[in-house]
Swiss-Prot record:
List of residues that carry N6-(pyridoxal phosphate)lysine: K264
A GO term for molecular function: glycine binding
Name the UniProt record assigns to this protein: Probable glycine dehydrogenase (decarboxylating) subunit 2
Organism, scientific name: Methylococcus capsulatus (strain ATCC 33009 / NCIMB 11132 / Bath)
Cofactor dependency: pyridoxal 5'-phosphate
């Protein structure tokens, strides 16, 4: 039921009205509504009960284990939310003068410096508003670098076949042709195939390390040397930085440009479509091309860098400084943990992943790369169960909902058949991990004894299994007011 379905004429929720009505004097008449908007007429109690009931039907990090692979669904500390909502931060308008925003500018400047230290980069821009935008920005800087050198023959970006789907999309948006590099039997980039691919057309390579296969790229120094010798650059997709935070830095591996997902590694809330933050970091050769705005020191204070300060900048990704509320939460998270705490993030994330992987293998599951240890996540394949019992990865994921666990990522990476990608993160305790193993083991037994039960799951959720094909082809995404009843 929608909130509109609870509407009854004459009901109101006056306690939630704005304290100061908007002043519409001076607005042109043609911009003003002639009729009231079709908003629901409900009481405060109606509103509270409606949204409380909805929250109880949902999975969330605050209520459930959320092992969504490649998403780092860790707990978001409430202290970061409280501090980022302070009036001094929240009431600052982006068009306000620098003089009245020195506190915010100070935090953003320090965040830039922290991210430089953690990644081994020369400079950082906070302006990208999401990971995919950070990717686009990074590839755009690679293009600007080659164009500035009149090296226009470089029209290819190399992308591993296990990469995030946004990697080839970002490269294509910047006008590059995408050349796919296969993965070898151990889960690493096939070095021989890479040697055949690099050449005078190579603008760069996009890598995630650890990769989306959940393993650390063993031969990253050799990859960096190959691409650099060919005149290309290395792009680091920071989706999996949680596994190496404070342990090893992308800059030290040879990467020239990176993007970070603050809404993942640095624990800002995500999962509802945004907002996110995807800062980019670069080494010295790409520093002139960083997007604006950026924060710089100015005497005893701080200021925004403008286009006149960076004439070679690729420009702006948005009118203002990205999602500042998200940036502030990440800043507080770093300050709360400190460098030793950030190292423990990586240690506990990898410990939890390896413990969970070992327990699930003991329970009878197959991993994608049995000879490799997990980084911060790992991949199971239920292809054997599909052949023997006609159950799929989707069936396992749907059935997990009945046991009170959010489903892992399914069918990604694409090269692993019937896969579930599981990322427990560092914030889960052993009891939760053991309960998840027990649920998976019970489902594995059901797959052999009652496969049809899995095929119809979930059974205990407010909404049962959907017709996903129909939902994709005929989406119903917005409420529309009913047509007025014509007079008799």
């Amino acid at each position: 039921m929608l909130i509109f379905d609870r509407s009854r004429e004459g009901r109101a929720c006056a306690s939630l009205f704005p304290q100061t009505p908007a002043d519409i004097r001076g607005l042109p008449g043609h911009l003003l509504r002639q009729t009231p908007p079709p908003l629901p007429e409900v009481t405060e109690l109606d509103v509270v009960r409606h949204y409380t009931r909805l929250s109880q039907k949902n999975f969330s990090i605050d209520t459930h284990f959320y092992p969504l692979g490649s998403c780092t669904m860790k707990y978001n500390p409430k202290a970061a939310n409280v501090l980022a909502r302070q009036p001094g931060f929240a009431a600052l308008h982006p068009l306000g003068t620098e003089r009245f925003g020195q506190g915010t500018l100070s935090c953003l400047y320090e965040l830039q410096e922290y991210l430089k230290t953690l990644t081994g980069m020369t400079a950082v821009s906070l302006s990208p508003a999401a990971g995919a935008q950070g990717e686009f920005c990074g590839v755009a800087m690679i293009r600007a670098y080659h164009d500035a050198r009149n090296d226009h023959e470089r029209n290819e970006i190399l992308v591993p076949d296990a990469a995030h789907g946004t990697n080839p999309a970002s490269a294509a948006m910047c006008g590059y042709q995408v050349r796919e590099i296969p993965t070898n039997a151990d889960g690493d980039v096939d070095l021989e195939a890479l040697k055949q691919a690099v050449g005078p057309k190579t603008a760069g390579i996009m890598l995630t390390n650890p990769s989306t296969l959940g393993v650390f790229e063993h031969r990253i120094p050799e990859i960096a040397a190959l691409v650099h010798e060919a005149g290309g650059l290395l792009y680091y997709d920071g989706a999996n930085l949680n596994a190496i935070l404070g342990k090893v830095r992308p800059g030290d591996m040879g990467f020239d440009v990176i993007h970070l997902n603050l809404h993942k590694t640095f624990s800002t809330p995500h999962g509802g479509g945004g907002p996110g933050a995807g800062p980019v970091g670069v080494n010295a050769r790409l520093q002139p091309f960083l997007p604006l705005p950026m924060v710089a020191r100015s005497g005893n204070g701080y200021r925004w860098l403008a286009e006149s300060d960076r004439p070679q900048s690729i420009g702006r990704l948005s009118a203002f400084a990205g999602n500042v509320g998200v940036l502030l939460r990440a800043y507080v998270y770093i300050r709360l943990l400190g460098y030793p705490g950030l190292r423990r993030v990586a240690e506990y994330a990898t410990l939890n992943a390896n413990y969970l992987q070992k327990r699930l293998v003991e329970a009878g599951f197959d991993t994608a790369f049995p000879a490799r240890r997990a980084a911060h996540e790992f991949i199971l394949s239920v292809q054997r169960q599909k052949k023997e019992h006609h159950v799929t990865a989707l069936d396992f994921a749907k059935r997990l909902l009945d046991y009170g666990f959010h489903a892992p990522t399914v069918y990604f990476p694409l090269l692993i058949p019937e896969c579930l990608m599981i990322e427990p993160t560092e914030t889960e305790n052993k009891e939760t991990l053991d309960a998840f193993v027990d649920a998976m083991a019970a489902i594995l037994k059901e797959a052999a004894e009652e496969p049809e039960r899995l095929g119809q799951a979930p059974h205990c959720t407010p909404v049962r299994r959907l017709d996903e094909a129909r939902a994709a082809r005929h989406p119903d995404l917005a409420w529309k007011p009913a047509a007025p009843v014509p007079p008799r």
